[in-house]
């Protein structure tokens, strides 16, 4: 795939993720938008790693670490949201002020 196509697709995914993070009021939707942002970054890492030096796999290895962190976030994030929903009866971001009891 050509560099321009990957960059356009990655910018599109990143923009959707940022827009979703800014406008979403639901924690689950915010986690999904964060995953979109991380996937857009991974696409850039892999494509630029292939473009500049295809023999060294620095971008590929770094993207594997980002995927591992995203997997941990995907495992822990819904558990935290479930706990907040159980205690606060809402998953809306603007209603969950955890500093006040």
Swiss-Prot record:
Keywords: Chloroplast, Membrane, NAD, NADP, Plastid, Plastoquinone, Quinone, Thylakoid, Translocase, Transmembrane, Transmembrane helix, Transport. It catalyses: a plastoquinone + NADH + (n+1) H(+)(in) = a plastoquinol + NAD(+) + n H(+)(out); a plastoquinone + NADPH + (n+1) H(+)(in) = a plastoquinol + NADP(+) + n H(+)(out). Its EC number is 7.1.1.-. It is a multi-pass membrane protein. InterPro entries: NADH_UbQ_OxRdtase_chain4L/K, NUOK/Mnh_C1-like. The chain crosses the membrane at residues 2-22, 27-46, 61-81. It is an enzyme of class 7 (translocase). Pfam families: Oxidored_q2. GO terms for biological process: ATP synthesis coupled electron transport; photosynthesis, light reaction. It is found in: Plastid, Chloroplast thylakoid membrane. One of its GO terms (molecular function) is oxidoreductase activity, acting on NAD(P)H, quinone or similar compound as acceptor. One of its GO terms (cellular component) is chloroplast thylakoid membrane. NDH is composed of at least 16 different subunits, 5 of which are encoded in the nucleus. NDH shuttles electrons from NAD(P)H:plastoquinone, via FMN and iron-sulfur (Fe-S) centers, to quinones in the photosynthetic chain and possibly in a chloroplast respiratory chain. The immediate electron acceptor for the enzyme in this species is believed to be plastoquinone. Couples the redox reaction to proton translocation, and thus conserves the redox energy in a proton gradient. Belongs to the complex I subunit 4L family. This is NAD(P)H-quinone oxidoreductase subunit 4L, chloroplastic. It comes from Drimys granadensis.
């Amino acid at each position: 795939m050509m560099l321009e196509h990957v960059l356009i697709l990655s910018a599109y995914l990143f923009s959707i993720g940022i827009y979703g993070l800014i406008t979403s009021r639901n924690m689950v939707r915010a986690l999904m938008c964060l995953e979109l942002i991380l996937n857009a970054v991974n696409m850039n890492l892999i494509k630029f790693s292939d473009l500049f030096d295809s023999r060294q796999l620095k971008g590929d290895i770094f993207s594997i670490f980002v995927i591992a962190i995203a997997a941990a976030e995907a495992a822990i994030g819904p558990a935290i949201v479930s706990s907040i929903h159980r205690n606060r009866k809402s998953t809306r971001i603007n209603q969950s002020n955890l500093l006040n009891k």
